[in-house]
């Protein structure tokens, strides 16, 4: 203790010396000492020297200054230290030579002791021994505490003992016990590259009371300067508005202080007394000043202005901290009491992220620098010539001592603290913090409140504590609303876990903690050098959570922020671990350490246990609906790596009524690594059916959330309400999404990186580099560090969700519709990289009526397999997200979706379509305005083997549409969204009755087997169980556009100049190739099913007509005088012979005028007679000058079209559809597809044959066979004319016993198209033969002379051999090209629901435009030689581009908008048509389309009323070839049967244009057309018909040539006046016409002669026409390739292929040659002339002297040559599948030569072939003569061969002549070649 009388100057010098020896302050000189005395020392503006402070753990001191430092008192009286305006600037630094984790996580006690050691130890030389003695005396007492827990205590400097050391130590301890330190206005600035923080402390006080040291800290604030962040919300009335003035005042005062500091610094620099201990301090001081210069530009200290700036956000505020402890060297009884901590979450989130990212970045830089340095050292060390030094040994030893690998687990002297208490922790998710510590925002703020946090440190093994109250509060208008709270009642104790061996109660908190909301404890135990740490947290009270839109959004943003912080922390932690691992495995030279020098890290186990009570969450979706979730207790166990929840109950609360809608059972969250099977679609596909299978892979997941079952049930009303509220919730969510606490809005700095993805990428690249580095080192040291290996597993997913079973039931969909049950099994979703992928193994949706009725399947796997039998998921999902769009890929496989018409009927009664459409468009428009145009949503669907089931409403049939492969893209735009689909390989299947599905037991077993066997496609599966394929489509492209922003699109189109009509729903369908394969019964079922796929349309009388009127009507006002004419006059007028009398004229009236007569609506639906008398009139364009008829009604055809044209420019259509079909082929087959049809026919055949047998027995008994004198023929054709319409599908027996010729038939009419008849007394077995011949072209060659006849009735076998299945080849094919359908629905208003009637006179509902570019119908009947049945008249030349063969326009209007009924206006135009009608083809058409089955009859819907029907003029050119004559029809009055007596060739008809009015239904339309055109044809078209008669056709054409000889020159002369040229043209036309006709006539005669000769040769046993078959042409040697073929074409007792006159009388059926098709199908060709001249030849042949069986004469008149193919006679009906191939008859006029040269070549070829046949016959005759044993046999051989030797050369001559004449005639007029190719069937073998 110095005496008081010491002069002040000496005291200053002494104190200056002492302060300089502290090695803490720099540049302390006399000017810094304001007042110095032994009891009071005041220092001002003292700077702290960073060099003298030294290296701080983990950071470097950059700047330090104390504004004012005052020391009061002495050693005996206590010391008081007051420091004011202390400013410290530090920068974090991580040295690679130190353990980074220890530097980051160093303890507070260790850092405090090191700082004290730095301040009090004198490191200078022993210049002053007294000072050293005093310092050494004080050192042990101060540093013992700091060094007690250090692992490097041996490195501390040892002090020399002193005699006064004990006394001084006791004195110092007494002085320190009286020490009082007070620090005010402490500012600590932490600077780094990306983050600057300021820690402000208003006041810190240290004093000692009764041996207990008290530390009180007040006003702690943490402020961020960089990055620039959002401080949070602030209220307008908050005190922050007054802060600018205060900040200005404070800045002013700070500026004054800064000026003083600057002045003091200048005087200090210029002082002569200024001294330095070391020269290096000048450099460090200069460095310090240069570091501060950028901050001193504003004349302030570097840390003074930033904290006071209003733009600097405050991160947290602590009002006070009280710390109590005892002792100095050993601190005991440490208790920490913290008052209130307030945290602003908005600015602190990006700040923490920035800190973590900055640490990671600096660590990487240090790592790269160290690695580069190590590589450099290794290079020098590897060079042997370079001198080696041992100076590094000390560093290595130092490194080994200062870099411990193992943690120090030695027992400490005591716990770090005894008790920690924090009164309140308030975290605001939105509000900013004011400098006063209050939150700035008092409204719409969300606060997390932790009240009374207590933590007690019982011993080194146990820490426990709790949070008394934890709640989340929302502050709105100064009112607190509890978001989260815990129940204050007694919590259940059964949920408390028992994590350790000790009872939980023994280690629990005191009694007050038992009331805490949250309790926790941490237990540490060391067992066999393994450290066990158990942390247990218990939420023992029931929690209640109340959420609304704003709160949920704030919590969501807060959760995203916390997640981002966690990601950044993980990145930093992984970087630190990698760097520490690198340091631990390499020494200072960069070499890998030896294994012996590396300590083995002791293992540690961490156990975390979490247990909660039940939690109730209430979400307010709207004012009327809340969503409530009850979560059962949650259990989490880290060692078991899982969290479990027994159950979660979700319910809705509406009007106080709670309804359970969903239950989640057995929720498990596992962090254990698990492998699972996943499926993903392949990137590319090749052609084939099995290449679309997904790729199966095995993935692993470290985080899996699994649920055993999700069960939900809700009514449709509740679901609608829930979905509607969710939609409103989502839309308002988007509006509220830009909250202040969102991570995006919390940062103002645009360059700030919020995500840690880039850091992760950098870290991964660093790890890869380190791996490469260590691999290089391991080659030398044979050491590899596994922690540095980059295990980038591409098959490891970050998260997986798995649900084993999901059940969802929608109840009370409609009163009659029932419930819908949804079942999903094995639902799996996982996140791989940035994609979310998933699969649903099985999906099944059923409709359940709930009253015990059958369940209707809606969606299911098409084979109905169980889930465990399905190996491939039905649904695959892949969700991709990028900066531009979110894409969802959904793959659907093996689905069957059922369509039920009955459901539409039920829905139609409940749903208002207009309201739905309006709601949809309104919602879309509203939602589209919310969508951001920068990021769109795309949904892509892929379909593989999916099926659509079509179930009609009233029929038992069913159809399936199978989609082999397809894809669909759904794109959402700003004003519209698009659906683009492409479907490939579509198949249409149908079955007549679902009861006929043959799913046998074996099929069920096959369906239940695992799919490891061969994959079964839906087409194969359904055809195997009874369905038949009736059509297929190659490809369909579907585009749907839904326009939601109509007004915006209209404005855009106006700017672009587009005039296209708009529609709310625009549909476009483009399809490539289509094919239909139909029989008569399957076609009938298909048509009826299509009609039944729509709900039946029916109206009541009140809906159709106006029953009552408002005003009285005078019925006589609109009726003319001519109406009341005599009925007989009206009848005579309607049936007048003159065509003009059947027309009515149309007056010119106003286009906008229409007269509606009420009586018309009253009687239009009840009486067809009134329509016939009033409206069924005709207006033909040819009678333009016709006078007015008796009727005074006038019609304007352009009335509706003229008014409707203006609407398109202003009105938007609800729906517009465009359909384009490129190619469509329809194949019509004979036979029947349905088993029921075949069974009915077989039964009818059996009954007819039974009746015929009885009649035959009766005739035999009476011995009368007079009625068999004529040739009788059984028929299988259309019904007779006397069959009534009431017999549709009914078995009808037609007995004509009253015929004039006394000839009666036994027969039945089936399906209105099949007539079975057998003449009484004839052979009944011939009926089966005739049926087989008609259907399959099959003819059983039995010997007619066989006396034994097997009847079907007796044996019961032959009728089973009926060939009634579908024929192998089609009979007719229809080829349609470029079908275009444009449909526009102008209104969807239903007058029954929408009573808002538009103010218009009429209403146009829809319009349909149909165009077909080409229509070709091909004749493929085996008995016909013609090619095209119908086609365009190509002889007129090529038509214009864009013209269509058929155009039809249909417009439906509502004459009265108040009524539902509509009327149609039809306009049809057809191009000229060319017809080649063969009677067999015509009969097939009639039989095909007249087929009616009573099983598929439908009630008549609302009959269409045709208001106006227009038909353009039609030009026809007809060729007709009759085959048979129905004499019974002639006798019954069928006048049209006389047409079959004539052959027509080129008959021309011109049907005039007509207009019909008031037609009720299509049947009446056909009758009216016939009624109108028939008189015109009879009166004006007979000349064109008669000109086409075959015998007169050539004469007429030659006469036309003579006419051209005169008419053409006159016409040409009138045109140009050139006489010679006109005569030349006329002569040329005459010569061309006449020459062609003469040559054509010669060719016909030659061909006819050839036919007669071939038939004659065949009668005598020759080959006949079969010699021209392809088989005989190719088989030159006459060998039979297959021995079985010989048996096929021989019969009875004959052993050779040919029969002669003596052997059999059936000569026309024995010599058919077989052609083996190269593709494996047997085709039989027979060339025979069936043209115009054939009938003459047939008559000549009929009257020939050749002996023929009279019964076969009529069969030969049909000129059919058929083949026989043997079949196994099996009772099973499946033998019909192997039906016979049809004989292809080819005309002699086919393959005509185009010129003379080709004609001569074909003639020469024909002569050579026929002479070759003659040569073979001569050779055979020579062999037979040589082989004959007597003259009789030789004569017999000569008689048999002579006719053939004579006729065959004649056949060759006639054939050659016809070919030559055809070539010459076609060269004269080449236009006939086109008609020839269209008319005659083409044969490729001729070329």
Curated annotation (Swiss-Prot):
Q: One of this protein's GO BP terms?
A: protein transport
In this UniProt entry, which cysteines form S-S bonds?
Answer: none
Where do Low complexity bias regions lie? 141-162
Superkingdom of source: Eukaryota
Catalytic reaction(s) noted: a 1,2-diacyl-sn-glycero-3-phosphocholine(in) = a 1,2-diacyl-sn-glycero-3-phosphocholine(out); a 1,2-diacyl-sn-glycero-3-phospho-L-serine(in) = a 1,2-diacyl-sn-glycero-3-phospho-L-serine(out); a 1,2-diacyl-sn-glycero-3-phosphoethanolamine(in) = a 1,2-diacyl-sn-glycero-3-phosphoethanolamine(out)
Ranges where the record places region Disordered: 125-164, 227-267, 288-310, 487-513, 1188-1209, 1260-1304, 1659-1696
Q: Which UniProt keywords apply?
A: Autophagy, Endoplasmic reticulum, Lipid transport, Membrane, Protein transport, Transport
Query: What membrane topology does the annotation report for this chain?
Result: Peripheral membrane protein
**Major site of localization recorded for this protein:** membrane
- Entry's Gene Ontology cellular component terms: endoplasmic reticulum membrane; phagophore; phagophore assembly site membrane
Subcellular location as annotated: Preautophagosomal structure membrane; Endoplasmic reticulum membrane
Q: Where is the composition biased (Acidic residues)?
A: 253-265
Q: Which GO terms describe its molecular function?
A: phosphatidylinositol-3-phosphate binding; protein-membrane adaptor activity
Identify the InterPro entries for this entry.
Answer: ATG2
Q: Does the keyword Membrane apply?
A: yes
- Record field: compositional bias (Basic and acidic residues): 1188-1200
Polar residues: bias regions = 288-303, 487-498, 1281-1291
| Physiological role | Lipid transfer protein required for autophagosome completion and peroxisome degradation. Tethers the edge of the isolation membrane (IM) to the endoplasmic reticulum (ER) and mediates direct lipid transfer from ER to IM for IM expansion. ATG2 binds to the ER exit site (ERES), which is the membrane source for autophagosome formation, using basic residues in its N-terminal region (NR) and to the expanding edge of the IM through its C-terminal region. The latter binding is assisted by an ATG18-PtdIns3P interaction.
Similarity field = Belongs to the ATG2 family.
Full protein name: Autophagy-related protein 2
Organism whose genome encodes this protein: Debaryomyces hansenii (strain ATCC 36239 / CBS 767 / BCRC 21394 / JCM 1990 / NBRC 0083 / IGC 2968)
Gene from which this protein is expressed: ATG2
